[in-house]
């Protein structure tokens, strides 16, 4: 099971995703590809601050289609199990003197509660979070 991080999803939504990412994602069985509602929120928030107009409307429409259609049933929520994992990861990173951004902690906690690998270019954001990390750019 793979949880696609926001940076991977953003690139997949472009007209021409980098071949490393597009190729890696295409090589995976679609039913193993998931994302998190946290990633959905990050993408929609980024689009919401764009100037109003046709471009923003088209991008928001395309992004919503990705989450509602392409990832239908495969957008993972931050639930009670994720909350428990969040607390454990937070405490471990704090003890190690290595703070992790809240959003990245939430994504890691969701992945950990589902036994998923995080697919990201931002490997350092998830190091020490006790989740498997895959960087499609280095595969």
Predicted ranges, named:
Residues 1-39, 48-65, 139:
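Short, well-structured N-terminal submotif of metal-dependent ribonuclease cores
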Residues 45-51, 69-118:
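Active-site neighborhoods of divalent-metal-dependent phosphate/nucleic-acid chemistry enzymes
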Residues 4-5, 36, 100-101, 122-123:
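Histidine- and aromatic-rich ligand-binding microenvironments
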Residues 9, 40-43, 83, 126:
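A generic structural signal for short hydrophobic patches within well-formed alpha-helices
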Residues 1, 108-139:
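Acidic, PIN/NYN-like endoribonuclease modules and their adjacent C-terminal/linker elements
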Residues 23-27, 66-67, 75, 92, ...:
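Short secondary-structure boundary/capping segments
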Residues 11-12, 24, 46, 86-89, ...:
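Residues that scaffold the ATP/ADP-binding catalytic core of kinase and kinase-like folds
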């Amino acid at each position: 099971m793979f949880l696609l991080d926001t940076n991977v999803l953003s690139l997949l939504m472009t007209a021409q995703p980098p071949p490393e990412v597009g190729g890696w994602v295409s090589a995976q069985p679609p039913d193993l590809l998931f994302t998190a509602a946290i990633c959905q929120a990050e993408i929609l928030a980024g689009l919401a601050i764009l100037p109003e107009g046709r471009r923003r409307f088209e991008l928001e429409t395309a992004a919503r289609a990705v989450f509602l259609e392409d990832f239908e049933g495969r957008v993972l929520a931050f639930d009670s199990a994720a909350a428990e994992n969040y607390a454990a990861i937070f405490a471990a990173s704090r003890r190690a003197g290595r703070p992790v951004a809240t959003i990245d902690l939430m994504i890691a906690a969701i992945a950990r509660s589902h036994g998923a690998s995080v697919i990201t270019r931002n490997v350092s954001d998830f190091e020490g979070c006790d989740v498997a990390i895959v960087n499609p750019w280095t595969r």
